[in-house]
Each structure stands twice: as C-alpha cells, then as structure tokens.
Amino acid sequence: MKRTAWNIVFHSLIGLRARVLATSDPGLRGLEGVVVEETRHSLVVETRDGRRVRVLKANSIFLFQLPGGSWVVVRGEEIAGSLAERVKRLGRLKGVGWLVRAGEKRRYTRG
C-alpha cells in the first residue's frame, strides 16, 4: 500500500525525509534529515552532515515528505508506539494528517 496523508501513521517512517516543527527540546526545532531508525518512543534522523539525532515522538510535531513530494504534518502522539501498536490502537482508516502541497494547507481526516 502506498504511503499517503491518510495512512502515514500505519506505515514505517524509515526512509522518509523529516523535519521537526516543534518539540520540547528547543535545540531540535528545525532539524531536518532522513528517518533511519524508529523505536516506540523516538525517531532517529540522519542530517545532511551525517549526524544521527534522536527525537522523542511525545510532545513533538513532525513534517514528513511523502514519495510523491507532498508534505504531511503529524503529531508525535499519532505515531507513538511501534508500528504494530499504532495499527492496533488507531484501527484502519483513522489516520489524520495535514497535507501541504505548493504552500496550500488543508486538514484531512477520514473514518
């Protein structure tokens, strides 16, 4: 199944370009790179200079670039837990995300 704004929380985030929009650690705001590891409570983002930085999912807001080029804003609480736990907790077709394409913001919900 293709990753979309509707179902991003039901997929592994490894390999997606990510940007930290907000987090409880002010030093991590604006961090951008590729997700190289995902745990129950954190994401490891590799920056352009090769640094690997662990960002807690709780109390964070992330921007992920989908394979098609569009961007989705996801709250850390929506992706908390392992992939199996997320699918079990949220159930199919309950994904929520902000789709941002060409500067346009809209709230998309389904379910």
Swiss-Prot record:
One of its GO terms (biological process) is tRNA 5'-leader removal. It catalyses: Endonucleolytic cleavage of RNA, removing 5'-extranucleotides from tRNA precursor. This is Ribonuclease P protein component 1. Part of ribonuclease P, a protein complex that generates mature tRNA molecules by cleaving their 5'-ends. Keywords: Cytoplasm, Endonuclease, Hydrolase, Nuclease, tRNA processing. One of its GO terms (cellular component) is cytoplasm. It is found in: Cytoplasm. Its main location: cytoplasm. SMART domains: POP4. Its EC number is 3.1.26.5. Belongs to the eukaryotic/archaeal RNase P protein component 1 family. One of its GO terms (molecular function) is RNA binding. InterPro entries: RNase_P/MRP_Rpp29_sf, RNP1, Rof/RNase_P-like, Rpp29/RNP1. Coiled coil: none annotated. Consists of a catalytic RNA component and at least 4-5 protein subunits. It comes from the Archaea.
